[in-house]
Amino acid sequence: YTLSDTLSLHDALPIFRMTRRQLRLGAFIMATGHHIAAWRHPGSQIDSGINIDHYVDVARTAERGLFDQVFVADSPGVWHKGDEESFSRQGRLSHFEPVTLWAALSQATRHIGFVATASTTYEDPYLLARKFASLDHLSKGRAAWNVVTTSADTVHGNFGLGAHPDPALRYERAHEFVDVVKGLWDSFDDDAFVRDPASGVYLDPAKVHTLNHVGKHFRVKGPLNIERPPQGHPVIVQAGSSDDGKELAAATAEAIFTAWTSQAEAQAFYRDVKGRMGKYGRRPDELLVLPGISPVIGRTEAEAQGKWAELQALIHPSVGLATLVPFWPNDDLRRWNLDAPPPYYPEPPKGVNSRAHVVIDLARREGYTVRQLYEYLAGARGHWVVVGTPQTIADQMQDWFENGAADGFNVMPPVLPQSLNEFVDLVIPELQRRGLFRTAYEGRTLRDNLGLARPASRYAAAPAARAA
């Protein structure tokens, strides 16, 4: 194959990329780890939420393992529902704002992408567009935005609102929000900045575009005050399995984070969300489905089970009960018998995300006691927990990947940094041995490594509008 003189190696990467489909892997990190008792474990960094050296080490470990990206969840409020005792025993109360954190870590890494959560309910489109464009420039094309509408009904008080908006309104706003942000990222054509000292011309004003958006929720003039991001647009990620969430992903997202413990349910979700994309003029391969997996790794099955038992033994009952409060918000769970089933199964409260339906249905179907239910949620809040050897874990991942349940996974280490080190040292080589995962990064940007196309500007085929 002969490249034309104008086609760069960067542009040609999709031509030369291996044709065999391979896993996409993200490292989904939470301070001390995903298990609710992780901060008490000797393998954790106890002050990790505000320890930049810890995050540098974690990002470099993930990059050593050739992960596509690292991701931290975020909320514009404190993560807690429960009584004062559980509040005092909860290890996730203090943590960095993610875009700030990733801006710092982009200077300590070279290849790995950075996914930051930001809410379309409690952020502003112009400021968010500027923030993520800046991160994409700082990281040289490794930024991604995890679009959330914020399901927590405890946040509105931080923003002067009398109530948390209902889900339908939040998702309606989200669709418009994402469209505005993408339009702002296209404010400048890729070649708008001439920067020619000889002529004295810095910018071609014919290649600057004012958005002039007027919609139901936003009025945004533009242009943005930073040039087009290296990736065109930072990668758009979405997390949500409700019907509204699937529609938002089908319309706007390039990756979706989801939570399933059953392969059959994961397969149904995979077919459903990809099947919705055609009406938005999109192909199924333009969206990567990445379920969460929390691996507890041992060199033997007995060692892995022992590690899991050790973590479960660290759960204080008050912290365990606090994980159930979102599903039973109108009851005093301290009165419940921990070793009996919940006294009743409610309809999930308004505004609680789709995972609430999964959890309540599971508790009813399996006949879990209260203790068994919070122990089930303790590992990864309802995500898939796999306990076993590197070979067992690779078997499970391969099975889901090759049978239409996933395009890859969000790996959720139960304890940090210990569990991520184990995954990189033990599971990654097994996946590589099977040809399921890369042995080197393919490109320079997060889009390159995820196999996603760089989006054209919405103005590429239209006459340029002069900036006002």
What are these regions (language model features)?
Residues 25, 62, 66, 105, ...:
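Conserved, mostly hydrophobic/aromatic
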Residues 26, 44-53, 102-114, 119-231:
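Hydrophobic, small-residue-rich alpha-helical packing segments that form membrane-like cores
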